[in-house]
């Protein structure tokens, strides 16, 4: 990071957090700022892939909420570095609630090449992933493919696959997400739902 800064190369700091290091979040933010990062992205672990092995280390719901509220206050005051909690779609619910309580407009900033920053989960809505075998997935955390580009066109998969169509239809969502007034700005993490409930609409 210091070499990047020395040579005028912009860089981003990505950090992943679980129970074992959640207390370090403010310190990591401060370090990224001191290093001169263009952006700091706080990744909240999604329990898929290797993340399944540390399911018991996921941050509790209560602590998660406190961290997102801390991020909201920090982001309001942060002028030099772009910041965003990644794979934490309910942050956008926190932003709306807090800004409404305070009677203030929240200015969201993002990188010029970023796909996110305006709403919660965009998997299968604005982005997707094509793996080395041609499988088309909603995001890098979501293990269920919507189709394969070796068998059908990407356009057909993107527009017509059952998986993508369901992800875009909030009326099909179940459980707390399905009845939440903030579903349109949050959407919940579908990969997290699939991992925990076995149903990406739950």
Regions found by a protein language model. Give the residues of each.
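Short hydrophobic/aromatic beta-strand element in the GNAT-like acyltransferase core
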Residues: 126-127, 177
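Flexible mid-to-C-terminal extensions adjoining Fe-S/redox cofactors in radical SAM and related proteins
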Residues: 135-136, 140-202
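Radical SAM enzyme [4Fe-4S]-AdoMet core and its adjacent flexible, acidic
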Residues: 1-123, 129-133, 145
């Amino acid at each position: 990071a210091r070499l990047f800064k020395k040579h005028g190369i912009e860089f981003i700091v990505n950090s992943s957090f679980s129970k074992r290091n959640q207390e370090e979040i403010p310190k990591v933010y401060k370090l990224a700022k001191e290093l001169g990062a263009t952006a700091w992205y706080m990744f909240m672990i999604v329990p898929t892939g290797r993340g399944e092995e540390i399911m018991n280390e996921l941050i509790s719901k209560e602590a998660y909420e406190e961290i997102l509220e801390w991020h909201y206050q920090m982001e309001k005051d942060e002028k030099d570095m772009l910041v965003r909690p990644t794979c934490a779609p309910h942050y956008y619910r926190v932003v709306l609630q807090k800004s409404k309580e305070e009677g203030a407009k929240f200015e969201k900033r993002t990188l010029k090449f970023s796909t996110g920053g305006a709403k919660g989960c965009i998997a299968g809505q604005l982005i997707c992933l094509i793996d080395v075998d041609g499988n088309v997935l909603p995001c890098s955390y979501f293990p269920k493919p919507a189709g394969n580009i070796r068998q059908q066109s990407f356009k057909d998969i993107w527009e017509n696959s059952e998986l993508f169509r369901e992800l875009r239809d909030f009326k099909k969502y179940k459980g707390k997400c399905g009845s939440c007034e903030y579903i349109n700005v949050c959407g919940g993490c579908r990969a997290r739902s699939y991992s925990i409930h076995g149903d990406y609409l739950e």
